[in-house]
Each structure stands twice: as structure tokens, then as C-alpha cells.
Amino acid sequence: MKEMLSLVSKIHEKGNRFIVEELKNNGAEGLVPSHGDILVCLYKNSKMTMKDIANCIHRTKPTVTVLVDKLEKLGYLKRESSDKDNRCTYIVLTQKGKDFKVIFEKISEELNKMLYKNLSSEESE
């Protein structure tokens, strides 16, 4: 069991290093792997509240706030007030965030190839 946990940890670490390097190579400096979880949620849903995002990525609202603040600062998303309820704020992708989807998918595809390259089709399922 210990060896399995060690292996999973090494795979996670190597995957994160790959993602960070690819983000940098594609001009997305400042982004980190944990930002990807939020982007995935927003690629699936056009607008979400902080609570919705927290539920989507299984993180606390304070953690989501820090991640969203950084993504907003980098220009990938913005906050919009609800037309129906001014107390409600939605998080939405900017054009930069929408355009980044192509790069995001490319990096994800490369990561999957790297992770599954030595596995048979049966093992990868």
C-alpha cells in the first residue's frame, strides 16, 4: 500500500510539473494546475457563483476566492452582478479565458498521452 501511495504521489507531482511547464511554454505564466479545475467548470457552465464553483471543484469558498482573484487578475475571468439579484455575483470567462480553452485542451491531451503511453488499452480503461 505504501508503494502505491508513493507511486500516485510521484505521478501527481510529475503531472503538475508537466502542466506548469506547458502553461509557461504556451504563454500562460501565472496559471497553476489548480486554476484548471475552475476553468473546466466554467467551460461547462457559462456563469457560476463562488458557491457553485466551490461545489464543482470540491474546495472551500475561501480557497476558491483566492484562485478566482488570481484568474481575474490574469484576465481569464471576471465578476458580473446578477440582473435579477444585486446580491448575487457570477464568475464568467473573459474572451482571453474562452480563447485559452484550445491551449488547455492541448495540454490536457498531451498529459493524458504521457500518463497512458506505457499502458495497454485494457489497463488504461
Descriptions of predicted regions:
Residues M1-E29:
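N-terminal leader segment of winged-helix/HTH proteins
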Residues M4, S34-H35, K96, E123:
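N-terminal positioning helix adjacent to the helix-turn-helix/winged-helix DNA-binding module
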Residues M50-K51, P62, D69, T89:
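Residues within helix-turn-helix
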Residues H12, L31, S46, I57, ...:
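Flexible interhelical turns and helix-capping residues at alpha-helix boundaries
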Residues L7, T60, V66-L74:
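Long, contiguous secondary-structure blocks with strong helical propensity
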Residues D69-E125:
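Charged, amphipathic alpha-helical coiled-coil/dimerization segments
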Residues F18-T60:
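N-terminal helix-turn-helix DNA-binding core of bacterial DNA-binding proteins
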